[in-house]
């Protein structure tokens, strides 16, 4: 019997053990070749059709559930006007930080005409550039609560106060109250003693009631301020509280705070100067922004306020895109109307969280179809069901991320980051579609190109995940969760490992995994978006770890001596 050099060097028991393993492997292959195939493998065309049907239904259901209209009781009848709404005169392409800032009188005129159909008054926050607003308010039959913006620069505050006094005295029939300062103590820009002096000065020079506006916690910290105002203006924003209230408990929280103020300041008139709910943005604990939740909160609050005879001002009239830079995406979406002055159906009528859902569904279906065409015929019978479903998941994630990016992106850097993640998902979708396809001709060449760079797509996903995880751990307040952007790459490279450089993959996996528990502690377990992100981060860390292991296996195989 001929014995190979390798067999000659091995002990007899080792050769026997190796031959036994070979025999077991051959037997397993024989059994698999003769075992009855599952029905879907015997009929790959049927499995493919089933996959197409399931994927189509899944895509349609995803976007329908996002955008279906919800019917809620209206805030008031069409002829019943509400009390007051906050108004800032900025268009969707304007910001108070633009200097020199130029107001658009025609836009302000149209804005007040629109607000006059639903409200009896508007509240403003600054006098700079708004000297003409009392005349416009008179034109449209609106009353004003005029505000002077007080900050840390005494000269700026002095100009604001002088203009406020002049406008209040020039338009006593329009200006029903004045507010000196807005959350100035919260921003720690002035002292309560300084505010007392300003309030006393304004009270001595105008006939209207004078107030100061602050979040409710700071009124309780500085109760002495109540002695210097004619009425208390408190801000009740359950979303922004240090302990946010979910939509189910928000109104109970508001009513409780309002009762506490009646007890803390007996006999003092109270205006709820700001209350509302955001329609877009990141979840804070159990407080979830959405159009439906905004409509639900506003409508229920108005009924509650009318029942109790509360004075109130809703925040705010129009969405303010410029606020996204300083308050995150959520800051720009407190309006009753959007930045284009279109009704969001917050006050009346059916309301949808995603009114454009048919457009996003069409985009997802088109991308899904393109992925199937790119992949071509499934490579194996078992892929016939998987290919349409996997492509649908990728198309849905791209669509959901696109819809989210449209909401959270305002500035160039944000759009570039969003585009980076869209491109990454498209590359991963192309990679998977081709890998599940038969792969002949140009498809085989393209798959080979993508396959050799699969580790880079994995590292690009890990880089995005690590950056976002660090942001959510160390600067989370205004950060959105990138769930739709990273779910697909994480799943693909967890199930189908890509060889990634050991050092980089290990570092990224460590950063992502190490941040999971801290961000959950910060967000608490009631935050569904945070829980989903933690799951995706775990998948992504696992994908990076598998990529690292794959690289070790490849390196070991390359260094092993030939038999």
Predicted feature locations:
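Aromatic- and acid-rich polysaccharide-binding/catalytic face
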Residues: 146, 176, 214-252, 277-278
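Substrate-binding cleft of secreted/luminal carbohydrate-active enzymes
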Residues: 288-347
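N-terminal carbohydrate-binding/catalytic regions of secreted carbohydrate-active enzymes
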Residues: 87-148, 152, 156-157
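Alpha-helical transmembrane segments of integral membrane proteins
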Residues: 380-563
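Aromatic-lined carbohydrate-recognition surfaces of secreted/lumenal glycan-active proteins
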Residues: 206-220, 268-273, 311-319
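Conserved, mostly hydrophobic/aromatic
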Residues: 122, 178, 232, 272-274, ...
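Active-site clefts of carbohydrate-active enzymes
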Residues: 237-244, 266-294
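Substrate-binding cleft of extracellular glycoside hydrolase catalytic domains
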Residues: 127, 133-209
């Amino acid at each position: 019997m001929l014995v190979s050099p390798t067999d000659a060097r091995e002990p007899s028991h080792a050769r026997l053990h190796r031959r036994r393993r070979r025999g077991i492997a051959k037997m397993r292959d024989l059994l698999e070749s003769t075992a009855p195939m599952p029905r879907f493998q015997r009929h790959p065309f049927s499995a493919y059709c089933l996959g197409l049907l399931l994927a189509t239904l899944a895509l349609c259901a995803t976007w329908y559930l996002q955008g279906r209209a919800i019917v809620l009781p209206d805030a008031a009848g069409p002829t019943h006007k509400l009390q007051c709404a906050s108004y800032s005169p900025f268009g969707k392409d304007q910001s108070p930080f633009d200097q020199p800032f130029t107001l658009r009188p025609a836009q302000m005129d149209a804005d007040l005409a629109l607000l006059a159909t639903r409200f009896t008054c508007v509240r403003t926050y600054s006098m700079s550039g708004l000297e003409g607003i009392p005349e416009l308010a008179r034109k449209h039959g609106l009353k004003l609560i005029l505000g002077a913006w007080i900050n840390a620069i005494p000269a700026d505050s002095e100009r604001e106060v002088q203009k406020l006094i002049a406008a209040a005295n020039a338009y006593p029939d329009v200006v029903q109250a004045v507010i000196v300062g807005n959350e100035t103590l919260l921003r720690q820009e002035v002292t309560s003693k300084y505010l007392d002096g300003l309030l006393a000065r304004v009270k001595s020079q105008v006939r209207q009631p004078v107030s100061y506006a602050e979040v409710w916690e700071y009124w309780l910290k500085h109760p002495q301020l109540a002695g210097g105002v004619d009425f208390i203006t408190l801000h009740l924003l359950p979303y922004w509280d240090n302990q946010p209230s979910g939509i189910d408990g928000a109104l109970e929280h508001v009513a409780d705070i309002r009762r506490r103020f009646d007890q803390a300041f007996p006999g003092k008139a109270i205006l709820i100067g700001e209350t509302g709910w955001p329609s877009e943005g990141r979840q804070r604990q159990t407080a979830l922004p959405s159009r439906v939740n905004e409509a639900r909160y506003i409508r229920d609050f108005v009924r509650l306020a009318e029942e109790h005879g509360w004075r109130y001002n809703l925040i705010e009239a129009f969405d303010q895109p410029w606020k996204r830079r300083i308050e995150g995406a959520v800051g720009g979406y407190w309006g009753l109307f959007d930045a284009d002055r279109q009704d969001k159906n917050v006050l009346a009528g059916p309301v949808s969280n995603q009114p454009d859902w048919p457009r996003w569904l069409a985009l997802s279906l088109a991308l899904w179809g393109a992925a199937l065409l790119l992949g071509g015929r499934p490579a194996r019978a078992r892929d016939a069901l998987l290919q349409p479903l996997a492509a649908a998941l990728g198309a849905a994630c791209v669509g959901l991320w696109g819809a989210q990016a449209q909401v959270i992106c305002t500035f160039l850097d944000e759009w570039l980051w969003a585009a980076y993640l869209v491109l990454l998902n498209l590359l991963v979708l192309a990679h998977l579609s081709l890998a599940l396809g038969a792969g002949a001709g140009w498809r085989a060449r393209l798959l080979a190109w993508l396959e050799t760079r699969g580790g880079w797509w994995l590292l690009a996903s890990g880089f995005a995940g690590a950056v976002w995880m660090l942001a959510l751990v160390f600067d989370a307040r205004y950060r959105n969760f990138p769930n739709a952007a990273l779910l697909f790459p994480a799943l693909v490279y967890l199930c189908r490992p890509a060889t990634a450089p050991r050092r980089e993959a290990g570092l990224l996996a460590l950063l992502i995994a190490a941040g999971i528990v801290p961000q959950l502690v910060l967000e608490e377990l009631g935050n569904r978006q945070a829980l989903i992100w933690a799951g995706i981060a775990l998948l992504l860390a696992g994908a990076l770890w598998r990529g690292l292991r794959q690289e070790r296996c490849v390196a070991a195989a390359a260094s092993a001596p030939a038999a």
